[in-house]
Amino acid sequence: MEQARDHLHLRWTTEQHMPEVEVQVKYRTAALSNQECQLYLRHSQQQQVLVVDFQAKLRQVFITETPRCGKKPYWNNEEAESKQNPGSIYCLLLLIRGGMSDSLIKREISNFEIVSKNKKN
């Protein structure tokens, strides 16, 4: 009962202090001691978390695509660019610059990780 009251209070205060257009309350579920707890975040806070995760993922993908042989990476190679065959990092950055949605960015990063793992095997 107390949890439900807290939830209603949080929702009411968020809606009171912010214009309806800006209110994009999303929740994520965290498992704590075998109990599910919903954490409600403002859009700006959630975006901040996404950026941190995204930067870590991008760094990880970048490392897996950097060759260790001393040659220029193919995604930063003029010859590759002239053949219009840039690497996945370059493509991903273009998609982000083009206004790709957060969910699509996450999906694309997952696809790159799968491809990178398959290349190693």
Curated annotation (Swiss-Prot):
One of its GO terms (cellular component) is nuclear speck. It comes from the Eukaryota. Belongs to the SNURF family. This is Putative SNURF-like protein. It comes from Homo sapiens. The gene is SNURFL.
